[in-house]
């Protein structure tokens, strides 16, 4: 106990450590915390548990904090950018969450070996939220709650099928609640085909 002023624990020997040890739960003794005097950093050898609503603050002004309130966990940054980086060669950044059945599944990952983003679950855009493609957002896809639109603001809008002998097929409602083909671009013959009994009105 200390009742006046600060309380110091000091190791004066050059390049030596200050080691906090305790029982290891099996009748022995082990290090829990080491202040390493030879390299100038602190090594934590055992888990640290923060109780609910006690945050871990990083930075002189606690600019980055991690906390858990008993129900939810928050990572909060209040100064500058918040960057997530993986410097491991060919390593990935993987985002996982509950799979709806009590398990864990990958939703998407940043693949460092092939430098692309892999998406394993649906992406849902709310009504009136555009998906933009191109540096200037020149191609946009959106749904307004009633209708869907593809919009191109620069250059041509091309629909291309590179598969040998395959088609581009245009389908729509058949007037009876089903879907049928109205016409298709036949990749095996090079013709535009209109199925039987389809009227072409001008």
Where are these regions (language model features)?
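Self-maturation zones of extracellular/virion spikes and adhesins
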Residues: 1-32, 37-202
């Amino acid at each position: 106990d200390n009742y006046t002023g600060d309380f110091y624990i000091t190791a004066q020997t050059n390049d030596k450590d200050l080691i906090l040890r305790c029982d290891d739960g099996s009748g022995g003794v082990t290090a829990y915390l080491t202040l390493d005097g030879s390299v100038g950093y602190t090594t934590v050898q055992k888990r640290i548990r923060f109780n609910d609503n006690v945050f871990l603050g990083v930075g002189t002004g606690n600019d980055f904090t991690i906390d858990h309130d008993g129900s939810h966990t928050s990572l909060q940054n209040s100064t500058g950018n918040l960057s997530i980086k993986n410097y491991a060669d060919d390593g990935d950044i993987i985002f996982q969450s509950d799979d709806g059945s009590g398990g864990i599944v990958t939703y998407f990952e940043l693949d460092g070996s092939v430098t692309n983003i892999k998406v394993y679950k649906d992406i849902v855009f709310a009504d009136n939220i555009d998906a933009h493609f191109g540096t200037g957002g020149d191609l946009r896809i959106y749904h307004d709650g009633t209708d869907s639109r593809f919009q191109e603001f620069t250059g041509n809008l091309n629909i291309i099928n590179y598969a040998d002998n395959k088609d581009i097929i245009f389908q729509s409602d058949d007037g009876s609640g089903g879907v049928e083909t109205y016409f298709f671009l036949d990749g095996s013959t090079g013709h535009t085909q209109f199925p039987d009994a389809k009227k072409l009105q001008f």
